[in-house]
Amino acid sequence: MKDKYAFVLKSIRKDMSLLPKKSYLNGKTYIVSGASRGIGFNIAKKLVEKGANVTIIGKTQNPHPKLEGTIYSALEELQNLSNEKSTVLAFPCDIRNPVEIDITINETLKVNGKIDGVVLNASALCLNDTLQQTKKEVDLMSSVNINGTYLFGQKCLQHMYKNKEGHMLMIAPPIDMLYTDDWWTNHKYNS
């Protein structure tokens, strides 16, 4: 059994990172949606730390009473982490809005010349009992999680396709979330 995983053990550095010592992200350009906070912000942070140019997008422009962070507070924190060779950009962008997506992509291309990857993290989730779920909530989740994610990914993919390279990472709820009785019982629509 030990020999089976020897290649993995050899690739793990002392800092427990599987990434190569010389970052393959240096100079690469990534766009991260839903990056005002949480998973999106932390992915953007790691990309910046590894030397990538990062454009973050999100809808939260003003402080929210229940949610931490704005696109501008995230930008400030990421700029403090970046080196002089990498750029960090931020745009308020609703991934359901083709005009805002085009502005984000065009400005990113204007500054960095290419898009090497996109992280599709923006989402909407309304956790209500299926019988309590409103049409408005279902429409919001469908328009963001399906239509918006598809539209934003498609537009970024067009530019990556021209470069004949690129990476796309789509964030989804954890699998174990779906295997609890409580999840299935109370949130059938969201599953």
Roles of regions detected by a PLM:
Residues 91-103, 135:
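The beta1-alpha1 cofactor-binding region of Rossmann-like NAD(H)/NADP(H)-dependent oxidoreductases
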Residues 169-191:
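Catalytic loop of short-chain dehydrogenase/reductase
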Residues 110, 144-162, 176:
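Amphipathic alpha-helical dimer-interface segment in Rossmann-like NAD(P)H-dependent oxidoreductases
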Residues 68, 102, 125-139, 180-187:
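Conserved mid-core segment of classical short-chain dehydrogenase/reductases
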Residues 1-29:
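Non-catalytic terminal and boundary segments that flank Rossmann-like NAD(P)-dependent oxidoreductase
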Residues 116, 124, 131-150, 165, ...:
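Catalytic Tyr-X3-Lys loop
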Residues 52-73:
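Conserved glycine-rich Rossmann-like NAD(P)H-binding loop of the short-chain dehydrogenase/reductase
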Residues 29, 36-37:
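Conserved glycine-rich cofactor-binding loop
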